[in-house]
């Protein structure tokens, strides 16, 4: 951990990228545990459990708080960014996922034998609130643990 910090002095950025990567990597085993299906595409796609976007922005905000303080402008910007990203993940993109699922079902039922398109819409775009909370917790707690190691 210390060698990584020496190479890249921005600890908040290191923490954010680390927890984004971990959250992306965890998606495949979690999907297998829940659905008994291995889907390696989850490593490079949006959506799923946990929210890697939430992990990233919460790790960044936590790093900014630890590095610059809770009263800093940097922390305020990171918190605002985190709120926007998490709202988008659980709200707007989740709604788009539901619409894609319904449109795919309509196409399947309405145009049986007469496909209008071979390509289906991607249904896994957003996150449930729980997936966002888990991602956020990973980012916050993970960054706190990393910071502790960096301080020793």
Where do the protein language model's features map onto the residues?
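Membrane-embedded catalytic cores of phosphoryl/pyrophosphoryl-handling enzymes
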Residues: 21, 25, 40-152
